[in-house]
């Protein structure tokens, strides 16, 4: 299905029938990604002992009905909001934009700490997604102001699809990189790492606070100057997608909570003209 859109004075053609999914498959019976020591996501047949119902056709029931247990922040692709850091509850699904968002996809190689940093000070073995790397990778010719950025870290190993990050220190954003995204007006960030901050960072959450516009130590939602921003973590960006301009759609269920499982979709533009 072809559509023609006008964005920032530029006419764009896009095939809405062929999106590329950036969501990791969460296989309850197989290998699956997880982070921060969370248990595996799991499912089991729902049972009502009083009624004698067991939600499994294999076990003789009339239909399948499963009880699913997972930690959205740690099991698979998820989208979160400023409510991740505040006393007041904010549901991520209420913040996720409806429709398509102008986006750019960039590929970067995380770098050793140098002139850029975070809080607490990165360890020598840490690897950072830096402002410098983002500036180098940013597409030169983008037909619109990107409101979303998708970051693919290199090397892009297929093992990311089911990696257990527990006990590891995956790459994370430098505070300079987070500030760059904010300065460029990016409201929606998609990354293929489990967190934009260091896994164990003494609770600082520096990049999160910068991206959501939440001052250090503040826990009131009213203090967040970018409460309409979202961060999507643990995505996977296939190699078949070239760096450049796209349209992003964030699909999420209407579940309460500051993070929800999500399915980011990228739509390639078939043409554009100013």
Residue ranges and their predicted role:
Residues 1-274:
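Active-/binding-site microenvironments in catalytic and ligand-binding cores
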């Amino acid at each position: 299905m072809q559509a023609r859109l006008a964005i920032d004075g530029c006419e764009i053609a896009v095939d809405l029938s062929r999106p590329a999914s950036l969501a990791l498959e969460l296989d309850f019976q197989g290998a699956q990604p997880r982070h921060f020591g969370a248990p595996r996501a799991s499912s089991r047949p729902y049972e009502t002992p009083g009624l004698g119902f067991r939600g499994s056709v294999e076990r003789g029931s009339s239909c399948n009905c499963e009880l699913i247990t997972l930690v959205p922040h740690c099991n698979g692709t998820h989208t979160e909001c400023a409510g991740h850091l505040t006393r007041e509850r904010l549901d991520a699904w209420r913040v996720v934009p409806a429709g398509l968002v102008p986006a750019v996809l960039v590929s970067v190689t995380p770098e050793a700490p140098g002139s850029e940093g975070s809080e607490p000070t990165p360890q020598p073995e840490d690897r950072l997604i830096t402002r410098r790397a983002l500036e180098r990778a940013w597409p030169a010719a983008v037909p619109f102001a990107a409101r979303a950025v998708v970051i693919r870290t290199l090397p892009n190993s297929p093992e990311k699809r089911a990696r257990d990050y527990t006990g590891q220190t995956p790459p994370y954003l430098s505070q300079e990189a987070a500030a760059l995204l904010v300065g460029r007006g990016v409201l929606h960030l998609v990354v293929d790492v489990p967190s934009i901050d260091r896994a164990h960072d003494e609770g600082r959450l520096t990049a999160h606070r910068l991206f959501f516009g939440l001052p250090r130590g503040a826990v009131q939602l009213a203090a967040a100057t970018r409460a309409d921003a979202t961060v999507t973590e643990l995505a996977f960006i296939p190699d078949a997608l070239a760096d450049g301009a796209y349209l992003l759609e964030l699909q999420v269920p209407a579940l309460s909570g500051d993070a929800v499982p999500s399915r980011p979709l990228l739509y390639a533009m078939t043409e554009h003209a100013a």
